[in-house]
A protein has these predicted regions:
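Short, low-complexity N-terminal intrinsically disordered segments enriched in polar/charged residues
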Residues: 2-46, 50, 169-180
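Short beta-strand edge/turn micro-motifs at domain boundaries
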Residues: 2-8, 14, 107-109, 114-171
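A solvent-exposed, acidic/Ser-Thr-rich amphipathic alpha-helical stretch
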Residues: 22, 34, 38-100
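A short hydrophobic beta-strand element
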Residues: 99-110, 288-290
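A short, basic/flexible loop-to-alpha-helix module at the beginning of a structural domain
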Residues: 155-181, 332-345
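N-terminal Rossmann-like FAD-binding beta1-loop-alpha1 element of flavoenzymes
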Residues: 174-208, 356-365
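Flavin (primarily FAD) cofactor-binding/catalytic cores of flavoenzymes
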Residues: 181, 204, 209-211, 252-355, ...
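Conserved N-terminal glycine-rich FAD pyrophosphate-binding loop of Rossmann-like flavoproteins
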Residues: 213-241, 379-402
Length: 613
């Protein structure tokens, strides 16, 4: 009984503390709102700490933009405040502010003139350190969900009424042939599918074109052993989560089947067997003319918005080594690798040392193939178990059981400014290096050249900066440590009739050469489909401008050209991993919906082009 009284007292004290903290935060939000409503920029900016960050996902800027420091915040407010008219800043329903290590954190809601928003604020010493504001929905153009979901059935007597299937068939037969889509998405992988699903729920006429025969074939057609290296909790699509018994790491064919199912149940207008041939922008009509070939027949589409969702791994980067035309054996890019089965008893050289190279080498070894990896530059490796532990607070079964939702996890991750993210990641990877010291020592003894990024900030920063240069270890590293997969470090001088010659004179005999040499930027597709001039106009896609390897400066603060307006009106890029495809599809779809409905979308801070395609 005495313990019960102690527990009750502690619970009461915690409740009072939460109530007091909530009251303080709401008073702070009220003061912030009053300054914004009054247009008092001095008062509003003074509520931010000297080091501060405001990341806005569409709500204020109609852009994806991070303001770093008080001066940038003042400039944004000076430009956007009159149009946005933000108000009703509140602690989010069923949420309470929390305090730890001198930082108060709180989920918030707010409104603008045209939208409702959600955000996350962090205070230090009574001032804003980080603020995330995101657009959730457009007023008057909300998704039909929950209480407003479609009825589906037509009850009562309705002479001549069409069934759901008849209406769906009619739409399928007309869109793109008798009526035009407002949005055309080129690429039907997870990026195009996630965006298509969002636009479908928002009532925006959209067609997704995919060159493969079935949805999901972009996964099915990859090498046999491919599985996702990200865990299931990180990889949900919008609206439909994976079942609770879904494997932690999804095999490629299972993901392919899920994507195919998803396109059907989400009622996407998905054209398979369709290749985009050419596109032109008509500035007078503000529309695109896109010629596609569908099942051998050319069709001309006239969308207002064109989205490239061709993927980070869709345009193979095939090297041009001297002597490739003389090789007597089989050679192909890793994207065309059929799997290991037909190579048993042969010698295979895999040029490259990132994810695909490791996966292919491991599968070849397991199939009884004599396989050698050629490492041309350093590679960052992190064990899958260690990576999962580092994100377990957001994406794990433990996180789910603790009340963490996918949407919240995404927003927490999005709320961390890129400018300081490397500082937050470095101690994570310092610990991983310490915990996995024996693992890394074994790789070093085997001759593997390791890195942890230019500033030791690890996997996520390397991915965000360049999208390459790493391997999430699911077993291949031990094969290298044990010498079962042979490793050679060096640069390729030429391909000979019988193998590979390195600059140090070493000869590697080969029956098969696999070029696991990565992929080029998505705007390479712009050059192919539209023109080189257009690709140069929009500039490089991906990267932060961190001035690290393969991510030249100046600092951009956000991913170049991704999920936001580009220098070409009506041209957009969408993609990334499953997490990014899910999360950012929300904000790209709202930008497109607003334009479809004629909602004013004055873009603040359109990204200048510093690097051509």
């Amino acid at each position: 009984m005495q313990q019960l009284r102690k527990d009750q007292k502690a619970s009461w004290e915690e409740m009072m503390l939460d109530t007091t903290l909530n009251a303080r935060i709401q008073a702070f939000l009220d003061k912030f709102e009053a300054a914004l409503v009054a247009g008092d920029l001095d008062a509003a900016v003074a509520m931010f700490a000297p080091e501060c960050y405001w990341r806005d996902l569409v709500a204020f800027t109609w852009n994806i933009k991070t303001m770093e420091g008080r001066d940038q915040i003042r400039e944004m407010l000076n430009s956007c405040l009159a149009q946005a008219k933000p108000r009703n800043w509140k602690i989010a329903d069923a949420e309470s502010a929390t305090e730890a290590d001198g930082v108060i954190e709180c989920w918030i809601t707010f409104e603008t003139e045209v939208a409702r928003g959600y955000g996350l604020v962090r205070l230090q010493n009574g001032q804003i350190w980080t603020l995330l504001t995101t657009m959730v929905e457009l007023k008057g153009h909300e998704e039909k969900a929950g209480f407003t979901r479609p009825l589906g059935a037509r009850h009562g007597v309705n002479p001549g009424a069409k069934t759901w299937k008849e209406l769906r068939d009619e739409e399928t037969e007309q869109l793109g042939l008798k009526t035009q889509p407002y949005v055309l998405i080129i690429g039907g992988g997870q990026g195009g599918i996630a965006l298509g699903a969002r636009l479908r729920q928002l009532g925006v006429p959209t067609i997704i074109v995919e060159k493969n025969a079935r949805p999901g074939d972009s996964w099915r057609n990859r090498y046999k052993s491919l599985c996702l290296h990200d865990p299931v909790w990180y990889d949900h699509l919008p609206y439909i989560d994976f079942p609770k018994n879904w494997p932690v790491f999804s095999p490629k064919d299972k993901i392919g089947d899920w994507l195919e199912m998803y396109t059907k149940v989400m009622e996407l207008n998905y054209w398979t067997g369709t290749t985009a041939k050419h596109a032109d922008w008509d500035d007078a009509k503000k529309e695109w003319t896109v010629v596609v070939e569908r099942d051998g027949k050319e069709i001309t589409l006239k969308p207002k918005q064109l989205v490239f969702a061709t993927g980070m791994s869709a345009k193979p980067n095939m090297p041009q080594f001297k002597g490739m035309d003389t090789f007597k054996g089989e050679q192909h890019h890793s994207s065309r690798h059929p799997g290991p089965d037909r190579y048993k008893g042969k010698k295979v050289v895999v040029i490259g040392s990132n994810n695909s190279a490791h996966d292919i080498c491991a599968a070849l070894y397991e199939a009884g193939v004599d396989v050698t990896m050629v490492q041309r530059s350093t590679t960052h490796i992190v064990r899958s178990d260690s990576l999962m532990a580092s994100i377990a607070d957001l994406y794990s079964e433990r996180a789910v059981r603790g009340g963490m939702t996918t949407a919240k996890a995404d927003l927490i991750f999005a709320s961390l400014p890129y400018k300081i993210l490397h500082q937050l990641q470095k101690p994570v990877y310092d610990k991983i290096r310490q915990d996995d010291a024996d693992f890394y020592a074994g790789l070093t003894r085997a001759g593997f050249r390791l890195d942890f990024g230019d500033d030791d900030s690890g996997l996520f920063m390397k991915y965000l900066r360049r999208g390459s240069g790493y391997y999430i270890d699911v077993g291949a590293s031990q094969l290298i440590i044990d010498g079962k997969v042979k490793l050679v470090a060096g640069q390729v001088e030429e391909i000979t009739p019988n193998g590979v010659r390195l600059y140090d004179g070493k000869e590697l005999p080969a029956d098969v050469i696999v070029y696991a040499t990565g992929y080029s930027s998505m705007n390479g597709f712009v050059a192919d489909l539209i023109s080189r001039d257009m690709a140069d106009k929009v500039g490089k896609v991906w990267g932060l401008g961190s001035n690290t390897t393969k991510d030249p400066g100046p600092w951009e603060g956000e991913q170049r050209n991704m999920w936001k307006p580009t220098q070409q009106e009506g041209l957009w890029f969408h993609g990334g991993n499953l997490h990014q495809s899910r999360h950012y599809s929300q904000f790209l779809s709202l930008q497109l919906k607003a334009r479809y409905e004629g909602v004013p979308t004055p873009v603040y801070g359109l990204q200048p082009v510093h690097h051509k395609a």
